[in-house]
Amino acid sequence: MKKFAVAAAGLAVATGAHASDGSATLFGLIDAGVSYVSNEGGKRNVYFDDGIAVPNLWGLRGTENLGGGAKAIFELTSQYALGNGAALPTPGSMFSRTALVGLWSERLGSVTLGQQYDFMTDSLTFGSFDGAFRYGGLYNFRQGPFSKLGIPDNPTGSFDFDRLAGSSRVPNSVKYTSANLNGLVFGLMYGFGNQAGGGLAANSTVSAGLKYETGSFALGAAYVEVKYPQMNNGHDGLRNWGLGARYALSAFDLNLLYTNTRNTLTGAAIDVIQAGVRYVGAPWTIGANYEYMKGNAQLDRNYAHQVTAAAQYALSKRTSAYVETVYQYAGGSAGAHAWINGVMGPDAQSSSRSQFLARIGMLTRF
């Protein structure tokens, strides 16, 4: 990350503050590589892909000292496709990843308003309870043979269905995150539906989460319910909750993760269990995990086994090269075809019960 002094020029004009009263930070993530997929609609494919190990982001974070241990804070983050430079999720969009402003106190915590992550992402992903966040990237998050889950405005109906990839944020939201209380951090969030005549419940989002860390052991839990205008006039949606545990042992750490996703209108539901291990020994970071995804009767009792292995080699403090492999096997109904998360396109689903992926890439942070 690169800090730059904007207080004397920009911030001072906008806020009347002196340079010592605040700061702004430019930050970003860049990832690109080449991926091989064994079966996309019955055919092999080799292609350029980006935003896999980490999403391609750039943004600004800023603070202004208010006195008494309090600060005003803001964050504006844009996502883009490195291959063509287009903004995501749609060309022309700006700061679509996060856009928030708020107040922070070391003693009381923070209150933020805007478009921001719910606690499935905050508590479980950023709490390092998911191997996908630590080494597996987008391909290691969950999708599988569950298109009937029917998430609105979702490219496959089940892409990132438990929300841990952070691909879905909460607009029009108010979020409280506590200070660190002897290792415990908790939070609450409410996202307004902004639907005239719909009351506070329609199209709304409610989320809560916590993380407790002591020594080498950590626990996390999170809940979110998102209601969509396409589902029962904004009174039904998707409900997610999850639990995570992490234990560090010398250069190794182990993680366990459980998530449950339910369509509150149709009753379709998926349970996920993941177990993983990571080794960190400079310049190497090596990780592997296994996850089992199981749908209920509304999803034809389809299931998927998935194994991911990845290795990163640090070229510097900011830049790494990496390799990754993912294998998924799907079962259940006759139409249960494997589909690794992040393999996109009209024929991206495997024509069979298995799909294998290998990737080589690089990432850098600033």
Residues covered by each model-derived region:
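Residues that define the transmembrane beta-barrel architecture of outer-membrane proteins
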Residues: 46-56, 94-97, 168-172, 202-206, ...
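Outer membrane beta-barrel
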Residues: 20-36, 45-193, 202, 211-215, ...
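Transmembrane beta-strands of outer-membrane beta-barrel proteins
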Residues: 24-32, 68, 72-76, 111, ...
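Outer-membrane beta-barrel "beta-signal"
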Residues: 350-366
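Extracellular loop and loop/strand-boundary signature of outer-membrane beta-barrel proteins
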Residues: 43-46, 86, 161, 196, ...
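Structural signature of outer-membrane beta-barrel channels/translocons
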Residues: 61-65, 104-106, 177-180, 211-215, ...
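Detector for outer-membrane/organellar transmembrane beta-barrel domains
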Residues: 206-314, 324-328
